């Protein structure tokens, strides 16, 4: 599989566009131009490729990459979605729906990260083993079909936080066209909105194993319980929610503007009773709300 280099001029984070404000504001036109330059750089880079596999989860980033690649290369793009216990069915459904709506070539494959003891042990670099499993499959598909490039949806904001999963794509020569073009999450949401992608305002997503504290074993039973608990919250109208699984305790991380609603007596009773019916003994609401990589906080405490 070949690895190519995109040569682009990146704008700084302070130059990224915002969906807030009006066109008449003094900074709107330069910001819009900056976004359009990034989009043009992405389109040019994609058009230089003969064919491409997109690691397509159906999240904000990979959905936009799939859209942009399909726009540039048409049927020469294959979007591949992994099906495993760690991947919520809700997200697979979104991936299928968007692929059908926009006409992507879409393939769903089974991955077996749960068969890897090193993954189930849930070390701090658990994501590496999951990504290694995924790209082992994608590399095989690429070889069978003569597709020279695999790409993921990493963006320019993903350089922060603790992300051991990024090592695996580097080992397989996976490209990150959104990152290479300087596109941030905010940029991608705005471009997705313009393109009519229903994923443009989807909350950030991560695999279900990310709800389990490091060094606590990942099991099929835990993943099913977490998925069912989060489905309860989605059905109750909560958009941003993570059920952090602490054995018999469900610690709910919600959007900051949704915490008050969860604590209303009637709603609190509904959440508590439904999650206890699933098997949790205690249900708590984290007063700090949802934050990216919150379980990494425990890693930092272990290092003190």
Predicted regions and their residues:
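C-terminal boundary motif of the adenylate-forming
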Residues: 239-246, 286-288
């Amino acid at each position: 599989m070949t690895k190519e280099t995109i040569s682009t001029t990146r704008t700084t984070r302070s130059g990224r566009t915002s969906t807030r404000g009006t066109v008449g504001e003094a900074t709107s036109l330069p910001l819009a131009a900056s976004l359009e330059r990034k989009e043009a750089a992405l389109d040019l880079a994609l058009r230089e490729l003969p064919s491409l596999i997109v690691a397509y989860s159906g999240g904000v980033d990979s959905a936009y990459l799939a859209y942009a690649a399909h726009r540039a290369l048409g049927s020469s793009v294959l979007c591949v979605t992994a099906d495993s216990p760690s991947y919520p069915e809700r997200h697979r459904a979104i991936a299928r729906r968007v692929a059908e709506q926009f006409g992507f070539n879409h393939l769903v494959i089974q991955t077996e990260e749960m068969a890897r003891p090193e993954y189930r042990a849930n070390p701090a670099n658990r994501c590496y083993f999951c990504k290694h499993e995924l790209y082992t499959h994608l590399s095989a598909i690429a070889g069978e079909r003569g597709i020279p490039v695999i790409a993921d949806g990493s963006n320019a904001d993903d350089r922060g936080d603790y992300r051991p999963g990024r090592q695996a794509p580097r080992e397989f020569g996976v490209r990150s066209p959104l990152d290479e073009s300087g596109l941030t999450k905010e940029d991608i949401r705005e471009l997705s909105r313009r393109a009519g992608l229903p994923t443009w305002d989807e909350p950030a997503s991560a695999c279900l194993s990310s709800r389990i504290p490091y060094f606590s074993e990942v099991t099929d039973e835990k993943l099913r319980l977490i998925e069912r608990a989060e489905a309860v919250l989605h059905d109750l109208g909560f958009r941003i929610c993570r059920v952090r699984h602490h054995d018999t305790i469900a610690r709910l991380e919600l959007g900051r503007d949704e915490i008050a609603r969860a604590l209303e007596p009637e709603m609190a009773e509904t959440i508590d009773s439904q999650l206890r019916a699933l098997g949790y003994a205690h249900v708590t609401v984290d007063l700090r709300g949802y934050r990216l990589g919150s379980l990494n906080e425990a890693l930092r405490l272990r290092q003190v």
